Curated annotation (Swiss-Prot):
It comes from the Eukaryota. This is Inactive sodium-dependent neutral amino acid transporter B(0)AT3. GO terms for cellular component: apical plasma membrane; brush border membrane; plasma membrane. The lineage of its organism: Eukaryota, Metazoa, Chordata, Craniata, Vertebrata. It comes from Homo sapiens (Human). Residues 48-51, 112-178, 231-253, 312-399, 466-474, 541-568 are extracellular.
Amino acid sequence: MAHAPEPDPAACDLGDERPKWDNKAQYLLSCTGFAVGLGNIWRFPYLCQTYGGGAFLIPYVIALVFEGIPIFHVELAIGQRLRKGSVGVWTAISPYLSGVGLGCVTLSFLISLYYNTIVAWVLWYLLNSFQHPLPWSSCPPDLNRTGFVEECQGSSAVSYFWYRQTLNITADINDSGSIQWWLLICLAASWAVVYMCVIRGIETTGKVIYFTALFPYLVLTIFLIRGLTLPGATKGLIYLFTPNMHILQNPRVWLDAATQIFFSLSLAFGGHIAFASYNSPRNDCQKDAVVIALVNRMTSLYASIAVFSVLGFKATNDYEHCLDRNILSLINDFDFPEQSISRDDYPAVLMHLNATWPKRVAQLPLKACLLEDFLDKSASGPGLAFVVFTETDLHMPGAPVWAMLFFGMLFTLGLSTMFGTVEAVITPLLDVGVLPRWVPKEALTGLVCLVCFLSATCFTLQSGNYWLEIFDNFAASPNLLMLAFLEVVGVVYVYGMKRFCDDIAWMTGRRPSPYWRLTWRVVSPLLLTIFVAYIILLFWKPLRYKAWNPKYELFPSRQEKLYPGWARAACVLLSLLPVLWVPVAALAQLLTRRRRTWRDRDARPDTDMRPDTDTRPDTDMRPDTDMR
């Protein structure tokens, strides 16, 4: 086996200057906590349920094996070898690729704005869980105290608390509304907690991560044990994992599987590059990539089982309530004795009455009661946490305790992800020396958190939820795929496969297998090209959003509306802003080198008019010894 050349001693000595993790456990927990986030709890179970249950695992595993793990390995390897943040890493590989690092920093900044807003929402619900009864358990009375608020009666108590008492949402994105002070306070508190945890980088996050990364697994286990003992839990699990293979013909399934991999592993954020830069240069990054990716996958499955065992109970409970209301209508209209119709007898009785009294039965307010319909009502994203799961808690004994556990788990999950997201912004800024050396890191961290907080106040407006959906749909998904594509291409085709494999051999003691080389060189770039092309095609369709409008004729269903022109422009800008750094930085580098070449040419004697041909960037993947 060929061995990579030994690096300069000065490069190795850099490890004494750069901060290091106290132990391997801190690093693995930080990477796992950064990767395992809110999406593992509410997006992955929803995708499994939407796309054919167990059938969704097929594209998910394929995307994980041929796209997720290889790119994850690339990020850990370049961060560990160069011992810099994303900007420093890509500048070292090629100055023309410095825009990739700037794009990662910009993307992490944008994601941190709306992600910590969700953490603020979670904090608001967590604080409201310390009361009995829970504030979303019943509708508030109207002004006359003669009934309940009409909007709440037309929807549900949990929906009213979410859309009106929490978000106080407007009916249209054009109506910005005012800042909601309770959300602003929770947002400030969330950023204050993040600042205190990342104030000194890995020195402080390495201590907090023991709790924030492990506590969610404890709560998931508690919910799983409790959920499996509830009636209807097995129905939820059967519905979740029953495969529908025909759904694999839908290209959207494969796109969602690919994007879920990027969200669940937090790829292309730059956070893993930053975390890996604090490792020992001889750390086995290949093993870390595989272990963390598999832990992340098992966490998603584990969370799906826990979530849908509880949602199966809710669906069964709603289904039985629907049957009971229909049975009561039949008993009252046909003067049957009380309890004369059981739930098991209801279908036969209804069929008999339809045959003998069809007109009379047609006039009754009977609803179609199908268990599958209630299982289909599970929601994705914040709706799962703030509407579906809060309603489920109400049916469980000791509802406030379960609410506190659930939102406490979400809060710690969100914090763990925020640690990596903020570190992806701060580490490159420290590496490039944005502030003078005498300015402490605590000041830069505080400045970044303050700017993020002020920028995120737009999400505390009454229209803030619409803006959050725009950021989530257009700032995150397309840029993650495009930046990941540039990462793979930059390492394999700009830096060079052989040189990269030599570096990995020096770090891990073994050269990458054909699996790694094939995925890096062909499979991952090809898959990413297809996914990016498909996303571009989706952008040609009219852009729509769903509004909460109590005056909508189909209320409580959300009204689908077209984005206004200015909002569409914002969508396009957000989808291009991070990746625009790539051509801009490359052009700036080209102009800088051209000016330098012209200046050198003017300074030479007239007899030597030959330009300097050695203008290639120094892409030796050795750390810069002139670093803090």
